Regions:
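Conserved nucleotide-binding/hydrolysis micro-motifs of P-loop NTPases
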Residues: 32, 62-66, 154-159, 186-190
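Conserved AAA+ ATPase "sensor/coupling" helix adjacent to the nucleotide-binding pocket
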Residues: 80-81, 186-187, 194-208
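A short helix-turn-beta junction within AAA+ P-loop NTPase domains corresponding to the substrate/partner-engaging
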Residues: 163-185
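Walker A/P-loop nucleotide-binding motif
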Residues: 17-43
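Sensor-1/coupling segment of RecA-like P-loop NTPase cores
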Residues: 25-30, 125-129, 140-167
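C-terminal alpha-helical "lid" subdomain
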Residues: 2, 25, 37, 44-48, ...
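Mid-core helix/loop region of P-loop NTP-binding domains shared across ATPases and GTPases
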Residues: 5-12, 16, 67-120, 124-132, ...
């Protein structure tokens, strides 16, 4: 489902591209919908924004292993770039050459002199992997190709640029980590209603039927006026009520919870269960709790509390 956060992420990345930023970070808690935004929306929305194909490689980070595994690092990027010989036996130098040539080819397909690399799960990147990426960036620069690296990372990654600089990787931080922006969850009832309206209007099931998810799955309730968007306030209250005690994180709710709860309730209604019963406050609370919402938000709270404590210690130092 499309969200305000996805729109904001695409607009932010578009602005960074316009400003010729070499690298930046989108950060947010786990399960808030970052990977879904990258996998299902980023390419199409960037292409719409620029009125044509945008050369984009999305790599969900996989650890390359030991410090000598640069060849495996290149193989992972070759596979993400759609190279047909990504897994063929080659020396690290040969793989590096193949990768640079592939990226030059993709940049040319975009009709420009730039390529976008999106690294999902970037919090797992090691310093040596960042250094290997710097080398690739430099090789492309010599070919007059601008490589723009956007990292999609978990919340704790926010402090990584300073940590990288202090660890001797200032040139990495300066090249790829000078800008950052948060990826929010669902924050208001209006935002939630917008997302849930996607079940009513912005979807199709079965494919080619012309019916939305709600109409296709629950035709009788739909005919009787049932709409998922009308349930936004009830779901928001259920998510708020399920926050852990002394919650210290942002008032942002994950798309994982929203999708799980909506799917559960919609399928119950579709099965013939009583609509009023399945959309009661108690039913929404159960749907939220059973999706692991409280545990997930406890993790968000703990991370936020640790970051807050770290900032306070730094301020007293």
């Amino acid at each position: 489902m499309f969200t305000v956060a996805i729109h904001d992420m695409v607009e932010r990345i578009g602005t960074w591209l316009d400003d010729q930023i070499d690298g930046a970070t989108i950060f947010g808690p786990s399960r808030f919908g970052k990977s879904s935004a990258v996998d299902h929306w980023l390419q199409r929305l960037l292409s719409e924004r620029y009125g044509g194909y945008v050369p984009l490689v999305v790599w969900s980070h996989t650890d390359s292993g030991s410090a000598t595994a640069v060849g495996r690092f290149y193989a992972h990027l070759l596979e993400a770039s759609g190279h047909r010989l990504a897994q063929a036996r080659r020396s690290p130098l040969e793989r590096q050459t193949m990768l640079v040539e592939r990226w030059i080819e993709l940049a040319a397909q975009g009709g420009g002199r730039f390529l976008v690399l999106v690294i999902d799960e970037a919090q797992g990147m090691s310093q040596r992997e960042w250094l290997w990426l710097v080398e690739l960036h430099s090789l492309l620069e010599k070919q007059r190709i601008r490589l723009c690296v956007f990292s999609i990372a978990s919340l704790q990654f926010f402090d990584e640029p300073l940590g990288m600089a202090l660890a001797g990787g200032a040139h990495v931080a300066a090249r790829f980590m000078l800008a950052s922006a948060p990826f929010h969850g669902v924050r208001t009832v209006d935002e939630l209603a917008y997302v849930m309206r996607g079940y009513d209007e912005g979807s199709e099931w079965p494919a080619g039927s012309g019916c939305s998810f709600t109409a296709g799955l629950a035709p009788r309730p739909w005919a009787g006026g049932f709409r998922m968007a009308d349930q936004a306030e009830a779901l928001m209250l259920a998510m708020q009520d399920a926050l852990p005690p002394r919650y210290a994180g942002p008032v942002d709710f994950p798309m994982k919870t929203v999708a799980h709860a909506c799917r559960h309730v919609l399928l119950r209604v579709a099965s013939g269960a009583d609509v009023d019963s399945e959309t009661s406050a108690t039913a929404w609370q159960a749907a939220v709790e059973n999706g692991g919402h409280r545990t997930l938000m406890a993790l968000v709270s703990a991370t936020a509390a640790l970051r807050g404590a770290g900032r306070r210690e730094s301020g007293h130092a």
